Amino acid sequence: YPLHDSNGFRMRAEDIEALITPRTRLLIIHSPQNPTGAITEPEHLQEIFDLAEKYDLYIYSDEIYSRMVYEEGHFFSIASLDQSRERVILSNGFSKAFAMTGWRLGSVIAPRVIAERMMMLLQTTSSCVSAFVQRAGIAAIEGDQAPVREMMAAYRRRRNLLVQGLNNIPGIKCHLPGGAFYAFPNISSFGLSSEEFADLMLEKANVALLPGSNFGSQGEGFVRMVYASSESNIKRALERVADVCHQLSGRV
């Protein structure tokens, strides 16, 4: 289903419903999102849940960035809605909020019939997560959360720095992401495809971007930028991107 720049890339029930067919069994939702960082509000999640009830569908909610939000109380899980127990499959993990990328540790809450089948699949593929990784996960959940708060404060500063810097570059427009660590600026004014723009920035500015088209046709005209780096690196990247964009503006 499409996400629209005009509403900050938030999911809309009407866009999802337009694509439901008699063969549809599952809706996949993601909030906060990769690549946009957008967060879908509770009222819109309720509308999506109502769709699932109307068409008797499961909902798979990927909430890997649920702890990575920039406004207190902003995140809302669709699994917290009434009657969600038998319809929502919720997944989460440790790689983002606890900086445990590569540990391959996560969790799922699902209706019993789904959970039982997932257990069968797990047992015949990887058996289980190694014991020391499980202990690390317990320490992450039960331990002092101050490092997580400090990390998010740093991400907030980096987000603000990057988005403000992008919006100061003529020809680029960028929404302020509500979560995760991605920005998804609109670069369509330069007359290049997102892949051409990303290739040019890598070649001329030594800045690595991901073409929005990698995320589907709706991403054309956008690029994804990650601010999981130092403020000094972000400033340097902005200066280089701005220089190339100024050169492009002279040609458009």
What residue ranges belong to the model's regions?
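PLP-dependent class I/II
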Residues: Y1-V252
